[in-house]
Amino acid sequence: MVRKICVFTGGRAEYGLLKPLLDEIVISHSLELKLLVSGMHLSSEFGLTYKNIEDDGFVCDEKVEMILSSDTAVSICKSMGLGMIGFSEALERIKPDIFVILGDRFESMVAATAALVCRIPVAHIQGGELTFGAIDDQFRHAITKMSLLHFVTTDEYKKRVIQLGEAPDRIFNFGAINVDAMKKIQPLSKSELEKQINFSLGPRTILVTFHPVTLENGTSGNYFSQLLKAIDEIGCLKVIFTKTNADTDGRIINDLIDLYVERNPKNTVAFTSLGQMKYISTLHYISAVVGNSSSGIIETPTFKVPTVNIGDREKGRVLASNVITCKQSIKAIRSAIEKVLSGEFKDSIKDMINPYDRGETAKNIVKTIREYELPITTKKEFYDVSSTLL
């Protein structure tokens, strides 16, 4: 019997992580892939990236528009309401056997809620992680409680999902889905990459991705301005910016990026989305990654790229030795960037390993989705952890 697997994607970064899984589902004779596409994929402001999905040969079976042209807290709540309406209707039409959701964004939270109410089993990827500075932290744990199957990326995260009351026999640590796939992608040559992004990569080029700290009020502009001032103080840097997601106050950061690039056209460039190939290729040729994105923590260790993680947004994640965390201040950011650009630091991470890399992640997830015996209902018991284990 063929199982119908619906996979949700609400944005460019998420799709890049999911693509290896989609490829594996497609080649499985006992699985049928359905894609539910929403969020930033359908927004012109964020590049209409659903077209990238279609260019890769996939069919967007359902498209649910939900993003409003505002990034206030109230607007995001309204977007979530629109998503709930659209997702429930889409799931009713698709009628999947399993609904796959990755991560922790508000779009994913709404999708999981709709699936729970519609009594559709959810398979959640990357649960158990911590990001104390982002509202995604609460969303992630809530999605965990609404899910039947859990695919975590480290043993530490597996323990945390158990601590949330999920049975160990429904939790699988296969590593990060994108890490294994990234190693298999042949990057563009440096000259071809420079041609495609219309930007020359110098010996001191950094990639900057900075998102709002969504559990704080009104800090986005000040925090990002501190980063820009630190870059100015260091001097002689070439900077590639990738813009933020559709988070509260994200447009403040994007506007500052546009203004900075306009004032510094010779040594800066900005993209709404680099796309997976250009992003991976960029990691091969830059000197450092700077910002507060999970990609800087999970993906850069594979390429041994020196990385600065700023502030508390990603606080709580497992860190590889190529990542150093600094406080949110001009002085601290400048010091951290100067440190990771040093030859001494680069030499110190030559033999490092990526804690999120376990190999064949997508294949193992698909095998589990294909073979796991689904219960008749979505009922599940709370798994109590022995007091001796706490």
Q: What function would you assign to each model-found segment?
A:
Residues 34-39, 150, 240-244:
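Short internal beta-strands
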